[in-house]
UniProtKB/Swiss-Prot annotation:
NCBIfam families hit by this protein: hemL, PRK00062.1, PRK12389.1
Species annotation: Listeria monocytogenes serotype 4b (strain F2365)
UniProt superkingdom: Bacteria
Gene Ontology CC entries for this record: cytoplasm
Protein's UniProt name: Glutamate-1-semialdehyde 2,1-aminomutase 2
Gene from which this protein is expressed: hemL2
Amino acid sequence: MDHSMSKKLHDEALLHIVGGVNSPSRSNKGVGGGIPVTMERASGAYFYDVDGNKYIDYLAAFGPIITGHAHPHITEAITKAAQNGVLYGTPTKHEITFAKMLKEAIPSLEKVRFTNSGTEAVMTTIRVARAYTGRDKIIKFAGCYHGHFDLVLVEAGSGPSTLGIPDSAGVTKSTAEEVITVPFNDFASFKEALAVWGDQVAAVLVEPIVGNFGMVAPEDGFLEAVNELAHANGSLVIYDEVITAFRFMYGGAQNYLGVIPDLTAMGKIIGGGLPIGAYGGRIDIMEKVAPLGPAYQAGTHAGNPASILSGIACLEVLQEEGLYERFEKYGSMLKDGIEKAALKHGIAVTVNQIVGALTVYFTEDPVTNYAEAGATNGELFGRFFKGMLEEGINLAPSKYEAWFITSAHSEADILETIQAVDTVFGKMVQDN
């Protein structure tokens, strides 16, 4: 494929934008470098770049675009918002409608509040949990991404009984020491951490199904055990459903798994492609939020009509009968096709697939936690990513990210993708 215009634009972007991108994940650093493709437009399941190339898209903007690009119902809602004014700074009837829709879909949300992003939503749930419990520390799980605010840019210390250390320049040591990080799916380590720090732990922050070191499901009984022990300790349980809300069913991963948290943070899908976040939970906890309580959260754009109307339209689309069954069907088809192609060419892969989301790891071993994901072959993934791009398939540029199937993908798209995988695996073997 010709990418000459993408290269020209990236060279220009480097002169004006830090690193040439507005989020590090877009830089292709995770696939060994190279020029990121600049997109011109998107429609349905397809991307079109500035050089005129067409791609089947599984990036889905890192998750939000579950209905495909430029869905007509969502486009109509955004157009209506633009015509009526996109920002008021006052209450609107639409935010009530949307709050009711979220509560009906995810019953643990007894009260909700809107923010501008998933990062803001997670950040505020931690503040609210601290206000409710009178404690300061949180426990989180290694490799789970919860946004880019200081408190969650923390990696594990030397073990479950040690405090965290900064994972980014600019995060202070004192901030990192408010966080204990333990391996996902490792209840023994969680139990040890709580035994040491329990009376200081305000909340346990969990991705109920991990989406940030690939798609990784909790082992049987893990979330239930975490809930039980956290509550026995007087700590709250926060589910970060920024990726998972409405991903696997019309509702949250908590509905899908049957395990209920005290607070939930959401984003991505619920905005229909526009910036949004939301959080909610038990009434007695949520009433700690201003103006009813002492935990402050505000935002100029929070609850803006454009994002709210886009979100309402997105959830209306997701109520289509049989949609999630189709996601499951296509997800299973992709997993099966990738595994068969890998076996044919003698390439070791593990495919973690949950409904319409999956991750292809270059390893023969299971992946159930961050350390196992980190041990997979990133060099092979980088070659695979670039090969798929040349075959007209757009993936996330990192071995840790997921493929997302949207309502716009057809069975023909899935079959074309499987054929591309077979072609790329063949070239990878030939190149060796």
